[in-house]
Amino acid sequence: MNIHDPILERPSQCETHGEFIAKCFMNNHWTKCQTCSTEERAKEARDTLNAELRAKTARLNAKINNAGIPQRFVNKTLSSYVIDTNNDKQCAIFAFCTDYALDFEQVMKTGKSFMLLGSVGTGKTHLSIGIALEIIKRGHSAIFTSASKMFRNVKETYNNKGKSENEVLSAFTECDLLIIDEVGVQRGTDYEKDIMFDVINDRYENLRPTIILSNLSVEETKAHLGERVFDRLRENGGKAFLLNWNSYRSIAEAVNYQAVEFAS
């Protein structure tokens, strides 16, 4: 039988779906139950989709793991952040963070940075990690670190024949978004200020945004970081937001929230 021969048909029986008409097209090959064939194709499509989803999830989890986000905070998304809808300013900072994450492609064109400052437990870490998780989901890279850990990682290269100082610093300078937590709990030595400047300045020059988290006030943060770092963070409309409502961790009622632009 060749391709020009007429199609042959014959009744056949499927153990699952019962009677069907089998067809022979060429090489004496008879078709299977059409319903079985349709189900097999659908299963193959589902299996392919599930495999792609598993691979995508694995890649996302790897990026989150590489971002240095502590296990306690890996589920701290923006959508899980609880706000007091009666507090207009808390709603405003949440809206700012949400827009920052959703418009991150535009943020990367300007390198716009900002700070979340103020009292312990007001949700600064949650908001910043929520931004990181959102941009990672969108294909960008992020690093979350404390200032102390960043300084320690650099110092460890001095007595280590493994990574060089430049290799360690590149992890902080080359990611799309860098979040530096606990700024201000260090001694603020010249060495620490120099490392901070090197990181922030490199990111500033390459339009890579940075988020600073600190329990200090605006003026205290400025004094701790130094004029050079502070000036670079305020470029392109960089802002400092002062969170001074009651502890977010206890889900208490929110009070006074003030958003403050960098002083000129």
Regions found by a protein language model. Give the residues of each.
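A short, basic N-terminal segment
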Residues: M1-C91, A240, A252-S264
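Walker A/P-loop nucleotide-binding motif
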Residues: M108-S128
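Short glycine-rich substrate-engagement loop in P-loop NTPases that contacts/grips substrate
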Residues: Q90-C97, E134-E174
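Pre-Walker A (pre-P-loop) alpha-helix and adjacent loop at the N terminus of AAA/AAA+ ATPase modules
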Residues: A67, V82-F114
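Residue-level preference for the first positions of well-ordered beta-strands
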Residues: G111-M115, S141-A142, L177, P209-I211
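A conserved segment at the C-terminal end of the G1
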Residues: I129-L133
